Amino acid sequence: MAVKGAHARRGPPRRKLPKFETSRVQDLDQDNSPSEGPDAFDNESLDEASDAEYSVVSSDSAEEERLTAKPYNALLQLLNVGADPNGPARKKRKLKHKNKDNGKEDQVDKVKRSIPREVDSELQDDLDVKEASDDESESGDENDGIDEADRDAAAGSDPFEAHFSQPDEARLSKRIEASTKTWQTSKHQLSSGMRITATYPYAGNEQSLALPPLHSLKDLPLKRKLSETASEHMSQINAQNSSIAPYIFGYYDMLYGARTTENAASLRDMYCLHALNHIIKTRDRVVKNNSRVPKEGEDVEMRDQGFTRPKVLILLPTRQACVRVVDSISKFYRADQQENKKRFLETFSETDDKSWEDKPEDFQELFGGNDDDMFRLGLKFTRKTMKYFTQFYNSDIILASPLGLRTAMEKEDGKKQEYDFLSSIELVVVDHADALLMQNWDHVEYVFSHLNLQPKAAHGCDFSRVRTWYLDGNAKYLRQTLIFTSFMSPEINSVYSTYAQNVSGKVKINTTYQGAILDLPVPVPVKQTFSRFDSLSPVKDPETRFKYFTNTVLSSLAKNWSGSGKSSASGTLIFIPSYLDFVRIRNYLATSSQTTNLSFGAISEYTSVRDVARARSYFMNGRHSVLLYTERLHHFRRYKIRGVKRVIMYGVPDNPLFYGEIVAFLGLDPSAVGEAAEKGVRALFSKWDALKLERVVGTKRIGSMMMEKGGDTFTFT
């Protein structure tokens, strides 16, 4: 199946659409560097690579290794002539002895029978690589002595042990059952002004998710290897992060809606430290259990693994964002060697464009450096090495854009899907979710819908070591989901509500808004009018909004239109959040008898740079009386439109920063700023716009504007 939303550089995918000719004008004349390691797969742009090079489980270098390894594989086959062909590929000693717990043995057999043992040649190549890697020293700290995390585990206070490693099965079963029926909700506010909505599955006993803040790294259950490096780079936890640290390190789901350019780095450090701590503890448990077998005998019960190796998935908007995350990971994880780091920097990192110095800070953070949104990367950690570009099935952490990951999961013909590497993900991080919202949110939903599904193939799994809640199909109830966004939206809330099912509970953290209307970058007061219309449901909202706009807003403007097009309606910018609404309004202006005398231009995220420049010039010079302008175009370009004397917002923007930037267009012409301020801004809204409107008018005002029955027009200056 073809994936919609092809990658782009600082902009959306440009489709070759039929040119729209009906706008009226007045009568005036990467470096495709070779793989540097046997585990690498090609992460270059699709414009430079074929689908085969984007295989999750194979690459050019992996193919070379497979060819050179054939004699060794043949020797292994000769040595295994007498082996049981129906047994698992590795660690067969467990199956030679009858399990003391017959129920669990039956459970293992049931899952094994449901997974086909046949795998294709490419997948077998990946298993060969995995076999070789097992001889390495993994990221275990068995020689480091007993650290704080070990003492916490022994004392039963380590969240990792309580949540993943050794959960109370009876309590877990009750919570899973409760999660499908009843959730309890509580709300409280922090001294910093942050609002927390906590939800947990009600299993017959009250639970408080109002956790005390963590001010010191000593309060975190970190492995000693990480505690030392964390103390160097995070000497203390700031006041804002101290309130959310207990939920991150305590394995609660969290939707954090107050991400900014100022706190982005500290939030990134926190979730990277947490992800590393989880990876190291997971691998330590496996390594230590491996050493227990010779001492305690082969009948010892050890449940310490998932179906596949990857445990952490981090979704990011751009390659440069991936570089920042990897930098954060590498400063906490001191590796003696970093394989393929040079290739990583060459293909993922770029310098900032100096011409963007006048752009807003949030724009520079998102689009600075390499802004390609088509990428994926596997990271593997051993005791002394950090490896880049490892194959997914041999990786501990997967970093990817939603588009890049989806193209790895499905083929264009739609016949083959590969998502088993997501079957054992225990921590999902979505950073800068609001930026992903401006790309193609459908890719995010697609990835979440394929998390923690039962794998279609064994992939060398030792089922005798798989945790019981994996075998029961309950991994999604223990997976931790962390979403960081600059603002909330219905789409983000939907993913959080649908896929965040952590039995420990989940918290939604939002800030209190003063309102974008109070901080406008205009030298004079601007008249701001908000018009409410009644809408019965979200499904009917687009139709209701369109009728209100054409019958009320356009009709009032039409009175000022003349045959020449020069009227008091000139200089009108119509800001439209949705591209679908943009197309509908553009077509209406081009064909309606109501707008016969109107000259207008229309620019969107799919308009060519040349056509955008022409439309802006015509609008500034008065040849266009009206200019249609989409939110996504503003997100990707941040134009400063000149000639604006009136702003009509078909809907308020998702990003509150955009409101101030759009209103600032009124002050770009000093000679006409007084007239523009008087005409001001008119924004349409319904009750379904509550989240967006709160950020624009402020938390204190939103209630009265939604519930006011005495009128539907609200004016601020």
UniProtKB/Swiss-Prot annotation:
Region called Disordered, residue ranges: 1-170
Residues annotated as transmembrane: none
Annotated localization: Nucleus, Nucleolus
Acidic residues bias (residue ranges): 39-51, 133-150
Pfam families recorded: Utp25_C (PF06862), UTP25_NTPase-like (PF22916)
GO MF annotations in UniProt: rRNA binding; U3 snoRNA binding
Biased composition (Basic residues): 1-17, 89-99
One GO biological process term: maturation of SSU-rRNA from tricistronic rRNA transcript (SSU-rRNA, 5.8S rRNA, LSU-rRNA)
One term under GO cellular component: small-subunit processome
Biased composition regions of type Basic and acidic residues, renumbered to the chain: 18-27, 100-120
Keywords: Nucleus, Ribonucleoprotein, Ribosome biogenesis, rRNA processing
InterPro entries: P-loop_NTPase, UTP25, UTP25_C, UTP25_NTPase-like
Family: Belongs to the UTP25 family.
Quaternary structure, from the entry: Component of the ribosomal small subunit (SSU) processome composed of at least 40 protein subunits and snoRNA U3.
Described function: DEAD-box RNA helicase-like protein required for pre-18S rRNA processing, specifically at sites A0, A1, and A2.
Protein name (database record): U3 small nucleolar RNA-associated protein 25
Organism: Coccidioides posadasii (strain C735)
